Amino acid sequence: MIKFPEDKPRVPKKEPRYFFIYGKPMSGKTFFASYFPHALDINTDDNAEQSRVPFVSLLKDENNEPVSDIRGRLFEIIKGLPQTSFKTVIIDTIEDVVDAITKQITDEAGEKYISDGKLSYGKGSGMVKKVINDLVLDLKALPVNVIWISREEEQTDIASGVTKNIPALKQKYYNIIAGNCDLVIRTQKT
């Protein structure tokens, strides 16, 4: 005979720590993320001044000059996090991070597009994917909450005419990031 557990809530062994939040602009993504404990916003879209969360600009340095080594800056931030009191890292927005990494890789290769010349046959895309994988794994190794923020876009199925809201992050990168998250959240204004 099977022995049933008691009918009472259990205390989970692990709280969710990895979140993917997406929504339309100004739908409260960063605002919601700002309520996580001791948050640091790694920002790409210049709206950090509107938030109550301390931030580091990924695309501009402390002198407001453009950063050319995005990968180096990302991993410099990650390397320095254990020496701080931050308990939450917000990546705002992940599609801008992917675009900046793609630009850096194409610039370094002297190519215009990620599939041109030295980067053809999937080499360039593979390089971007590796940087994203490394970023996910490096952040998961830290004892912090990680919040990935993405914008939202509409996708319409031409055959059925049905429109659905999806993250603006390309599917192949969404699968890597959301596959390592405990929860995917969509924000919307009511």
Please place each PLM-identified region on the residue numbering:
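Loop/turn-to-beta-strand initiation segments
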Residues: S85-T88, L142-W148
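Phosphate-binding/switch region of NTP-binding enzymes
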Residues: V146-T190
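Catalytic-core regions built around general acid/base machinery
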Residues: V131-P143
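Conserved P-loop
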Residues: I2-A100
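Short amphipathic alpha-helical segments
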Residues: S34, T102-K103, A159-G161
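Alpha-helical scaffold elements adjacent to nucleotide-binding pockets in ATP/GTP-utilizing enzyme cores
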Residues: R73, V97-A100, L135-D138, I176, ...
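A short acidic, glycine-rich active-site loop
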Residues: E62-N64, Y113-K130, A168
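Conserved P-loop NTPase nucleotide-binding/switch module
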Residues: I91-Y121
